[in-house]
C-alpha cells in the first residue's frame, strides 16, 4: 500500500537563498534566528530556554539547516543520529508567496510574474473598486492600502461595523484581501463578495494570485480577532500538479487538511478537511492518516507558523509552535506504514526577526521519513519540484516537467 503524507510548516525557512538579494532578504534565516533568540533567553515568553526540537532534529532538520547556512543552529544538536533523508531546496519560482511555493512542491513552478498592487496608499485601481461597489451593492469601502491584517482591524474595524463598508487591503504578496465582521456583515456575504472580486480580477487581467476572505469577530478596537473561517480563492495552477496526476491517472485520493485545497483552487483534491489551530490541524491529520487507503496523499498546511507568528514577527510564539509540533511528531511517525513516506517541508520563509512583515526568500527543509527511506543527506535541491517528481515516481504517474526524483 502506497501512501504519502506531506506536512507543510508554512513559512519555516532554513536560510537565505543565493538570489535573496533580489528580494532584500540576504541574511534571513527563520530557523536560525529563532534558535539564536531562544539560546540567548530572548524568547522565554510562554516557553523557556534553547529551541528544543529533538524529533525534527532526528529527521535531519539541523543538518539541512547546516547545509543551507554552513552553521549549526544555536543551542541545537548538530551531532544527533539522523533517521531520515534530508535536503535543503531552492525555489525556482519567481515569487516567495504561498501559491508559488505549494505549486512548485507539487511539481509546477511559477515561472511567470504575478501581478501586485504596489502602491502603499490607494492601492487598488478605481475602475476595479467601482465595479466591486456596483456588483456587490456596497455602501463604499475602507482601507484601499497595504497593511498588516491585525493592525487594520484596530484602525478600521469599528467604522466597518458602523457603516457596513468592507475593508480592502493588500501586502507585498499578490493578494486582494477583504476583512469583514462575521456577525454584522455576515460570512456568506463576505464569501460572495470575494467571489465577485475573484471574477473581476481574473476578467480584468490583473494576474493576482489570491483573493482572501478575512472574517473577524469582536466589538471594538483592541479585541477584534480573526476567525478560522478564512477562505482563499486562488487561480488554478498553470499545469497538472502531481496531485492531479495521482487522481486522474491512478484513480488515487488527495486529502486536503487546512488551506491546501484553497491554494490549489481545488484542483486534484478529492476530500477537504477544515481545522483551525496547530493542535486541531494535527488531530485532523492523524485521523485522515489512519483512514487513508492505497494511492492516497494526505496533505496538510500548518498555517499558524506563517499567519500567527511569522508575519506577526513573534519569535517566542513561533518557537513555542515549533516545540508543540515537535512534541506531537512521534504520533505522526507511528502511523507511517511499511511502504509509506512522510515529507516535512515548507513553502517559503517568514523570518520573525526580520524587518517588515513579509515573507523571506529562503531554502526550505525537505525531510523524508519511512521504513524504506535510506537516511542521510540528499544535498542541495535546485527546485522544490524535486518533491513533486519524487511523488510522481513513487506513485508511478507520468513524470513532471520539472524536478528530479530524490529517492
UniProtKB/Swiss-Prot annotation:
Cofactor descriptive note: Binds 2 manganese ions.
GO CC, alphabetical: cytosol
Reactions the enzyme catalyzes: 2-deoxy-alpha-D-ribose 1-phosphate = 2-deoxy-D-ribose 5-phosphate; alpha-D-ribose 1-phosphate = D-ribose 5-phosphate
GO BP terms: 2-deoxyribose 1-phosphate catabolic process; 5-phosphoribose 1-diphosphate biosynthetic process; metabolic compound salvage; nucleotide metabolic process
EC number(s) per entry: 5.4.2.7
Annotated CDD domains: PPM
Binding site for Mn(2+) 1: 10, 347-348
Principal location listed in the UniProt entry: cytoplasm
GO molecular function: magnesium ion binding; manganese ion binding; phosphopentomutase activity
Pathway annotation from the record: Carbohydrate degradation; 2-deoxy-D-ribose 1-phosphate degradation; D-glyceraldehyde 3-phosphate and acetaldehyde from 2-deoxy-alpha-D-ribose 1-phosphate: step 1/2
Cofactor(s) the record lists: Mn(2+)
Binding site for Mn(2+) 2: 306, 311, 359
InterPro entries assigned to the protein according to its UniProt record, in alphabetical order: Alkaline_phosphatase_core_sf, DeoB, Metalloenzyme, Phosphopentomutase_DeoB_cap_sf
NCBIfam families according to UniProt: deoB (TIGR01696), PRK05362.1 (NF003766)
Protein family membership: Belongs to the phosphopentomutase family.
Function: Isomerase that catalyzes the conversion of deoxy-ribose 1-phosphate (dRib-1-P) and ribose 1-phosphate (Rib-1-P) to deoxy-ribose 5-phosphate (dRib-5-P) and ribose 5-phosphate (Rib-5-P), respectively.
Entry protein name: Phosphopentomutase
UniProt organism field: Salmonella gallinarum (strain 287/91 / NCTC 13346)
High-level lineage: Bacteria, Pseudomonadati, Pseudomonadota, Gammaproteobacteria, Enterobacterales
Gene name as annotated: deoB
